[in-house]
């Protein structure tokens, strides 16, 4: 059950994300090719230290008992979130290199940082829709001897939210799903009239589908 402080932080995060234009209503196409009436652009959080720290705190609180020894943010948006968590909670971090250019394939380093094979690494991401980026990151980490069991995300866009990912069965925990984000936006009470109408329509559709 969510405590008062978590509920307050969730409300603050939704309010600021909407105010800075990170939450948008209307037709949008996701990187996965899926069409959505609700778009969340987490790239904007890097320009708002307040919302960055709030989102990072909420993500970290999904796992109050930490038993992984490393963090890795999915390139690129989640790198700032993972860094924020690493600094605040003193958890070592590794970096997955997404592009390898002008390097000898035999010397290509996919994961930067200090680590020992066999260590468990917790993956951090801003959101998950298809799960492809989390799986790719997990594969790179595992190829370097690290163990990946879990990913923490701010928003799980999947219809079957919080279901395990990939053949590894990576557990996914999220601050919001689309239905809970819509409810939080409506509860926020300061949506424009047009956005409120769309939010209510999305809420009705989600209730029918459930």
Curated annotation (Swiss-Prot):
5-phospho-alpha-D-ribose 1-diphosphate binds at residues 97-98, 125-133. GO terms for biological process: 'de novo' UMP biosynthetic process; pyrimidine nucleobase biosynthetic process. Keywords: Glycosyltransferase, Magnesium, Pyrimidine biosynthesis, Transferase. Orotate binds at residues 129, 157. Its EC number is 2.4.2.10. InterPro entries: OPRT, PRibTrfase_dom, PRTase-like. GO terms for molecular function: magnesium ion binding; orotate phosphoribosyltransferase activity; orotidine-5'-phosphate decarboxylase activity. Pfam families: Pribosyltran (PF00156). Its cofactor is Mg(2+). Pathway: Pyrimidine metabolism; UMP biosynthesis via de novo pathway; UMP from orotate: step 1/2. It is an enzyme of class 2 (transferase). It catalyses: orotidine 5'-phosphate + diphosphate = orotate + 5-phospho-alpha-D-ribose 1-diphosphate. NCBIfam families: PRK13809.1. Catalyzes the transfer of a ribosyl phosphate group from 5-phosphoribose 1-diphosphate to orotate, leading to the formation of orotidine monophosphate (OMP). Homodimer. Belongs to the purine/pyrimidine phosphoribosyltransferase family. PyrE subfamily. This is Orotate phosphoribosyltransferase. It comes from Chlamydia pneumoniae (Chlamydophila pneumoniae).
